[in-house]
């Protein structure tokens, strides 16, 4: 099987991470389920993982969820060749409940490559765009509104809590000073430049951009990412058939710690991966963003009758 699976539409060009590992995990389902079952792709994005699953397992159907209307449009186009085996809904997974038990729930957390690579979405500190960062650009508070509303202390606490940024106090002070002196930032690059200026000179040119942690913190807060993940971790085991699988790919330590703790303590689940699955050297060379991906998998324990 090829290491690279590329999904391309007019608006989405995304290489799903740990795709081969996902296929191998699905093979752990009972044989009778693989022949005829339903799985939930809780973060369908451009449809890359689901496309590979549907192609590999003719007996499996997928319900795909995403709160990003652009992702839903891309996935719908990409998966239309599978007919009624693929159904897609525009919703956050925390608001969803299936009408029947399913064989697997899968979630690929965080921001997709198309969202990062489209400056107008406001996620990127390398491509200029408005300070937005909302997964669903129709609803909710954007990044510009958030940093304007919070006090310096509240902003520093947010950056430290969700970004684990050691210079959070310095960064928050600079942001609030700039807003008071010159008004809103012109875009993402202006904010990233201000953040970089809060780092000691010797730390500004490392592989990880100085704005990475602050942008992560703002994005997590704006989209309530850890809150909705906690909801999924609580609800998903109830959606599963006995011996059904629950797989989550995370991209930073805050997400991974939540998933790890849930899989360890939830009595409805047993881990089938003691350590997280990570990308191969070959995959990382093809898709550098897979470097930080970790997949944890658990199985639904048979409920006591």
Swiss-Prot record:
Keyword list, A-Z: Cytoplasm, Methyltransferase, rRNA processing, S-adenosyl-L-methionine, Transferase
Entry-linked Pfam families: Methyltransf_5
Principal localisation: cytoplasm
Subcellular localization(s) per the UniProt record: Cytoplasm
Record-listed E.C. numbers: 2.1.1.199
Biological process per Gene Ontology, one example term: rRNA base methylation
Main EC class the enzyme belongs to: transferase
Residues engaged in binding S-adenosyl-L-methionine: 47-49, 66, 93, 108, 115
A GO molecular-function descriptor: rRNA (cytosine-N4-)-methyltransferase activity
Keyword Transport: no
Reaction it catalyzes: cytidine(1402) in 16S rRNA + S-adenosyl-L-methionine = N(4)-methylcytidine(1402) in 16S rRNA + S-adenosyl-L-homocysteine + H(+)
GO CC term, one of those recorded: cytoplasm
Function description: Specifically methylates the N4 position of cytidine in position 1402 (C1402) of 16S rRNA.
NCBIfam families: 16S rRNA (cytosine(1402)-N(4))-methyltransferase RsmH (TIGR00006)
Similarity comment: family membership: Belongs to the methyltransferase superfamily. RsmH family.
Stated name of the protein: Ribosomal RNA small subunit methyltransferase H
Organism name: Prochlorococcus marinus (strain MIT 9211)
């Amino acid at each position: 099987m090829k290491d690279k699976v590329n999904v391309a539409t007019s608006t989405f060009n995304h290489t799903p991470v740990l795709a081969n590992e996902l296929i191998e995990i699905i093979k752990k389902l009972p044989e009778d389920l693989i022949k005829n079952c339903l799985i939930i792709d809780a973060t369908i994005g451009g449809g890359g993982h689901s496309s590979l699953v549907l192609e590999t397992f003719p007996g499996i159907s997928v319900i795909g969820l995403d709160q990003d209307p652009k992702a839903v449009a891309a996935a719908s186009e990409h998966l239309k060749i599978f007919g009624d085996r693929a159904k897609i809904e525009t919703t956050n997974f925390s608001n969803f409940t299936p009408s029947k038990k399913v064989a697997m729930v899968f979630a690929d957390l965080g921001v997709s490559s198309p969202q990062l690579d489209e400056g107008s979405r406001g996620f990127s500190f390398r491509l200029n765009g408005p300070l937005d960062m909302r997964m669903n650009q129709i609803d909710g508070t954007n990044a510009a509104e958030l940093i304007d509303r919070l006090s310096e202390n509240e902003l520093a606490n947010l950056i430290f809590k969700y970004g684990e940024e050691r210079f959070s106090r310095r960064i928050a002070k600079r942001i609030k000073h700039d807003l008071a002196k010159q008004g809103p930032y012109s875009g993402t690059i202006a904010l990233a430049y201000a953040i970089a200026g809060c780092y000691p000179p010797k730390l500004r040119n490392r592989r990880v951009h100085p704005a990475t942690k602050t942008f992560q913190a703002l994005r997590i807060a704006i989209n309530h990412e850890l809150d909705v993940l906690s909801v999924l971790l609580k609800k998903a085991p109830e959606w599963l058939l006995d011996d059904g699988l629950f797989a989550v790919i995370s991209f930073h330590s805050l997400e991974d710690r939540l998933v790890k703790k849930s899989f360890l303590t939830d009595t409805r689940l047993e881990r089938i991966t003691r350590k997280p699955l990570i990308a191969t050297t070959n995959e990382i060379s093809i898709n550098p963003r897979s470097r930080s991906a970790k997949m944890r998998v658990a199985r639904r324990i048979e409920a006591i009758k």
